[in-house]
Structure formats: C-alpha cells, structure tokens
Amino acid sequence: MKKLTLCVILLFSSITVFSQTEKYPVFKDCEKTSINDLPTCFKDRLKESILSEFSIPDNIKQEEFRETINIVFAVNSNGNFKVIYVNSPYKELKEEVYRVFSTLPKIKPANYNNHPVEMQFVFPLSIPLDNNSNKEVIREKIVVEVFQPEKKKEKRPISNSLFPEHTSELNIPFTRAEYSLYDYYLNKSENSHTAVKPYVYSEVNKYVDLDAEKNKLIKPKSTWFGKKLLNEHMALVKGKDFWFTVDPGVDLQIGKDSDDVNTFNNTRAIHINGAIGEKFSFSTNFYESQGRFAKYINQYAESIKPDGGNPALIPGRGIAKEFKTDAYDYPVAEAYVSYTPNKIVNFQFGNGKNFIGDGYRSLFLSDAASPYPFFKINTNFWKIKYTNLWMWMQDVRPELTVDGAYKQKFMAIHYLSWNVSKKLNIGLFETVIWDDANDRGFDVNYLNPLIFYTAAEFSTGSRAGNTLLGLSLKYKLKDVSLYSQFILDEFRLSEFTGSDEWWGNKFGIQIGAKYHNAFNIENLYLQAEYNAIRPYTYSHDELNLNYGHNNQPLAHLWGSNFKEAIGIARFTKDRWFANAKIVFGKKGFDFKNGTDTSSYGGDVFHDNDHRASDYGNEIGQGNTAKIFIGDLQVGYIVNPATNLKLFGGITFRNFNPDVPTNEFDKTNSTWISVGLRTDVFNWNFDF
C-alpha cells in the first residue's frame, strides 16, 4: 500500500507574551541560534524529528482516516518531552504518538528570568498529506503560527479555562444536534458506549477535545459585553478546589400557524453549574415559561391534562396552569448531583430525563415525557458499560387521584452495553414498573443492581409489576453506524407462529443508520430510521402499571400501534447550522366518540382488558391516521458557551384520520416561527 505521510502544521500562538527574559526550549543543533530565532529552530527540529519517525498504523491507512489531531505536550523543567493529551479516538494512533515522543532527545528547557520552567504546546497533526503538500506548508512558514505555549500547571491541560465544565462530571445537555457531533468521535473509538444519554463531559473529553471544538467558534472580542454575549459564561467563579458558572437562559419564540393561531413562547431561565474538587459536580436549572403553541400541540397538551383543574400538560415539560385566556404557564425545575469516586463508577441523583438508544427515537427510554426524580449508577470496565437507573413516576389521571394526590409508581432499569469487537456493540435491556399496592412503597426487591427483574416480579406477585425486555445492536463502519432496538413486552411462541395476530404478542422494532461527513462533505450528517410497534405494547391491565409518566409515553412519543419512517439531515458551518427532517407514519388511535370505548392498542394508558379483540390485531388498527411531518430550521449560534441560538423554522404537518374527532381532527397545518433560545433540551413536537 502506498506509504502515507503526515504533515505537521505548526501554528505558534502564544498565550503569554514573551519578554527578552523568556527563552524557548533549545535543541542541541539550535544552541548557537540567536534568541529571536530560537522558536523557529525549535519548531523545525521538532517537526523533522517527528516526521522522520512517525508511522501511520495499518488500520488508520485502511480506513483512509482524514483528520487533524491535536497533541498537547510539554518540555518539562528537566528538558524532557512528555505527551499530556492526544484527541484521537484511535488507540493505535495515540500509542504511536507516545512512542515517537519517547524517542526525542533531552534538550535545554525553557527559561523564565533565568530559571528553568515547564512549557506546554499544542501540536496539530494532519493526516494524511503527500510530500508536496507537506513541503508547501513548510515553505509558507505557517510554522510560526502553531505552537501554543502554556504556563499552566493543571493535571490536565485546558486550552481555554473559560470552560471548566469540559473536564467535570456534569452531563452534557442532551440535544440531538449537538450529540450528532459527539457520536462521530465516539464511534471512531474502539471501546466507547453511546446508548445511554446524557453523556458526562469527562467521558466524552477522552475522545474529542471539547475545548478545541468550542474555541473554533470563539469571536475575537475585547469588551466585557462582547465576550459575555458571544463567547463566555455570564459569571464564572473559580477557586483552588471549586468552580461554578451562572448563566441566564431564554427561549423566546414568536410565530403563526395556518390555523390562524399566533404562537409564542416566553421562557426565562437560570442555569447554575459547578464542581467541588475533581469528583463532585452539581447542576440546577429553573425555567419560568408562558406559551401558546401551534393548534395541534395545544390540542394534544389539553388532551393529556392532569386531574385537578389545570388546563394542559405541555409535552416533555410539565403541568401547565392557565395564562390569560388561551395560553399556558408552565414552570419546570431540574437539578442533579454527580459523583465519580474512581475511573469505573459514576453516581447521579436528581430530577431530569434520561435516554437509552442510538436512534432519533428510543423504544427503551426516551426524553419525550416530563422530568422525574432518578438515581443512576454508570459502571465502566473492560468492554462493558452497565447502567442502573431507578425512577419515581406518577399517574395524573382522575381515576387514580385520591384527595388531590397523584398516584405514585416506580421504575427500575438495567442496561448492559458490551463492545463485542471494535465494530459490534450489543445492549441488553430490562425494566420493571411497580406501584405502592398494599402500601409496599419503593420495593427493595428491585434495588439489587444485578438481579433479573422477571424473577423479582414473580417473587413479589405476578400482577404486582410490569416487566419489559430489550435487545439493541450497533455496528460501526468507516463513517456509517447501523443500529437497532427490539423491545418485548409480552410474547407467546405458540401464538406468534400462527397467523391469528394475538393481542398479547406485544413487541416493537427499530432499525436505523447514521452517516457522518456524508459523501465526503464535512459536517454533513444524515440519518434514516424505521420504527414499528405492535398494538397494546407498553400497556397493562393494571391502570398504574403502564409504561408512562404524567400522561406521556416513556419510550416512543407515539406510544404504540404504529409504523414510522424518519429522514434527518444536519449541516454546520462555523456558527451556522441547518436541520431538516421528514416523518411518514401510520398510527391507530381509539375512536373516543362516546359509543366505541374499546382500546385498539395505541394508547399506552388505556387498560388492555378493554381491548377490541383478542385476535386479528395488526399495526394501525382502530381509527387509522396517516401522518406526515416536514420540518426545516436554520440558525446561528450566538454564544457557544451557553448554546444560545438565533433560529427560524417552518413545520408542515398533515394529519389524516379515518374518523375525525374533537381530539384527533383532520388537519393540514403550516407553522412558521423565529426565536432566540438557549438550546439545552429537545422539543418533541413531531407527533
């Protein structure tokens, strides 16, 4: 195979301006060089040494890897080279970097006021470039722009200390647009796990230099106002063993839909994040919001309203009270603490959301429902990531409300992610839902982090809980990842092999693919996904044991009894972004017309004892609706530190049921909106 060469593009950008009393490290060949020419001599000798020694690993050649990796290294006060950090997902590439630097000779260290000091540098390495390209770069003297000397003494270098969260145990806010970037780098790694979200900053920072990614977007500003508006956290307080940031947040939107509804959202928020020491991090977010949405969203929000007189429940957010005469007021509070005592285990406790899966949707656990209290343990060792998740849920329907108090229920999840090989990942999922029947409260039988929940459910009474099982697969190619999920609620082999479509064969399937840098276009991301879930999946014959929370499904937003195909495209260029999405689907609803009260299997909250039929059940049965949703959004990142975005979007939705009802009317609507938003969670309006 043709030998590939590397080009080292050396850029010198000093963090501290050097005076005449400060001196670069000196190779032996540079000892007679004038002090003004020492930087150039140092870079030239280092570049020559690395290029002559470096050999690209075979697997990198085979995959035709084309990236620039940043090597953070130092020349210590004794004159020895040491590698501090390499932002490459390839283990072999990291090992080669360490090997090459170990061959470098001991040199004279940098001097400051005639004292030897450690000096740190950033060394970008582009792979691959041919010899001619390499020589051109050297001749152009781009060398003078590359090395970034740093006089920091941190255990781990941070190229911009304005973002301390990047090395913390905080969660990265789960937004699909941002996570598509992280997925790219994580999928390049041989032993990463991508299903359980949100990710922790310190874990992702092993595979992608988060500071470098954010620094690409920094605007040169000299005024305090310009820095805070466009680049930085509003307030950053740091001490020797702690730090915290305080940022205001907004979600300000105005728009109009074709049903002549003037839409708006007015959210004011406060985001506080911080850490005490290296192992303990905390976060709190409070939102005060008023809004009126497109007509179909308002109708859905009112259809799932809670008992107690409040007019609506905003999907994904929470219970809303009336605002003026035709809008909603919906406060939301989220907070958690995160503790990582060692490299293996992370503990989190708080109020928020979780997501399990590699797809746009999840058949296991999604972020479609309102926030809830949770306790989570993530354990990473060898090729395994094992997640334990316990959640406290509630049912807000009037038939389960007693003296104004909503009915409580509990949920426990095990998810085991195993990297079978460099390319194949298998995930095993199980969950159980139970309530406080017989005043048992939170059942300690489900606290065991390793037990099979089916056995535990049987030991506490077969009707005392609802257990689901799942299997996920992911296979990684060069820039493509293939993924799937299978969820099993109930199953009888004798009924499955027949053609009678028994109601109790309750399962769902997802298959999908992601394509990063599609067609060799940098930052173009494509995704295709298909989901199908049989009638009555996630439902139960006990009112409170369904797979739902606050009148919202916990898995797929559509509940069950549907087929769906999704296509997604995302593109970014500097601070600009564009997202497009189309959704085709067919779903069966209940009729809810006052005469037919049967469950057709699409509403996870409808008691399946009231099913329409034992046999002959197929996807889309009942009041069948064809659904098409097209969505386009373009925008600009105003501040990358807080993910503040200016955007405009248009959504087209065609909803065509066989029998229009007050709750599910036949609609053909277009919704146009513009806004300014701190993008830290997903709005899920594609239903």
Where are these regions (language model features)?
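Residue-level preference for beta-strand/loop junctions
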Residues: F65-E67, V117-M119, F264, D329, ...
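A mature extracytoplasmic/lumenal domain signature
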Residues: F73, Y85-S88, F123, L129, ...
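Charge-biased low-complexity segments
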Residues: T5-L6, F18-P149
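Exposed, low-structure sequence patches enriched in small/polar residues
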Residues: G239, Y330, L424-F687
